Amino acid sequence: MADVVFRKDFFVGEQASLVKTVSEADVNTFAKLIGDCSPLHADDDYARKSRFGRRIAHGMLTGGLISAVLGNKLPGAGGIYLSQQIEFLAPVYIGDTITVTVEVTAWQPDKRLITLMTDCYNQDKCQVVTGKAVLLVDRPAE
């Protein structure tokens, strides 16, 4: 495992992103993991007759991609999720390529609190998720 790097400072406007294509296996595995087997996610025939016209990914699967950026990139090591406001703007379909971008909107070094705007877009540049995250950035153990 690589050495973990704890950052000491961040700046407003700093960004990080991740790109992920949502596969059928991702949706099926997520459904089993959390126990949400809604036919909108699991049944082709049911989903085809729905307002979406085909199977959709779980909203929180997309939300989980935000967590991946926060935990691995910005703020990275030591980031402890305190809150996440999230709004689902459009469905994510199996096969969609999602770009997740987080941007620092506030950094309080005295409190070690970082606030980030969290946005997700599909391959057509349609915004599918927007929100705001607040994290405590812990220091490494001495």
Language-model features: locations:
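Short, charged/polar low-complexity linear motifs in solvent-exposed/disordered segments
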Residues: 35-37, 47, 80-82, 112, ...
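Mid-chain, well-packed structural core segment of small domains
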Residues: 72-100
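HotDog/MaoC-like acyl-thioester-processing domains
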Residues: 1-12, 92-142
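Short, intrinsically disordered/low-complexity patches at protein termini
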Residues: 40-42, 52-53, 80-81, 86-87, ...
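Generic structural detector for well-ordered beta-strands
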Residues: 17-21, 87, 103, 134-136
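Hot-dog-fold acyl-thioester-processing enzymes
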Residues: 1-79, 142
